[in-house]
Amino acid sequence: MAKKITGYIKLQVPAGKANPSPPIGPALGQHGVNIMEFCKAFNAKTQADEGTITPVVITVYADRSFTFITKTPPAPVLIKKALGLQSGSAVPNKTKVGKLTKDQVREIATKKMPDLNAASLEAAMKTIEGTARSMGVEIV
């Protein structure tokens, strides 16, 4: 028989840098999850991408055990990483902060494809292009 699920926790944590301080500690603590056990498992699984913001969905069961699924980093994080930016533009329609080539967009879309609800790579590329435009990044 399957375990009874008591809740889901969605967090965005820097890869390889999970620690019991907020926001992780309080979020897991209120569900009765062993915080250090999660931190060790998460850090071991994500040590290759150290420092990159990684969304994680934690499923908590009635016996206080848990499983977690890591997702691909958010599109803005990948775009900023590709361009070497700290942040997007405060006024995206007026101030442009960088230029992204179609090849870079294709690379980001390919990486994000498992987590996007796009039917094709072209649709995923359009999604990434829209995100880039809203950050003040030009597509060339």
Curated annotation (Swiss-Prot):
Question: A single GO CC term, please?
Answer: cytosolic large ribosomal subunit
- What organism is recorded for this protein? Citrifermentans bemidjiense (strain ATCC BAA-1014 / DSM 16622 / JCM 12645 / Bem) (Geobacter bemidjiensis)
- Annotated protein name in UniProt: Large ribosomal subunit protein uL11
Origin: domain of life = Bacteria
Keywords recorded for this protein, A-Z = Methylation, Ribonucleoprotein, Ribosomal protein, RNA-binding, rRNA-binding
- Gene3D superfamilies annotated for this entry? Ribosomal protein L11, C-terminal domain (1.10.10.250), Ribosomal protein L11/L12, N-terminal domain (3.30.1550.10)
Enumerate the PANTHER family for this protein.
60S RIBOSOMAL PROTEIN L12 (PTHR11661), LARGE RIBOSOMAL SUBUNIT PROTEIN UL11M (PTHR11661:SF1)
To which protein family does this belong?
Answer: Belongs to the universal ribosomal protein uL11 family.
Q: What is the protein's quaternary organization?
A: Part of the ribosomal stalk of the 50S ribosomal subunit. Interacts with L10 and the large rRNA to form the base of the stalk. L10 forms an elongated spine to which L12 dimers bind in a sequential fashion forming a multimeric L10(L12)X complex.
Q: What does this protein do?
A: Forms part of the ribosomal stalk which helps the ribosome interact with GTP-bound translation factors.
Instruction: Answer whether the UniProt record assigns the keyword Hydrolase to this protein.
Output: no
One MF term from GO for this chain? structural constituent of ribosome
Q: Which GO terms describe its biological process?
A: translation
What does the UniProt record tell us about how this protein is modified after translation? Answer: One or more lysine residues are methylated.
Q: Does the keyword rRNA-binding apply?
A: yes
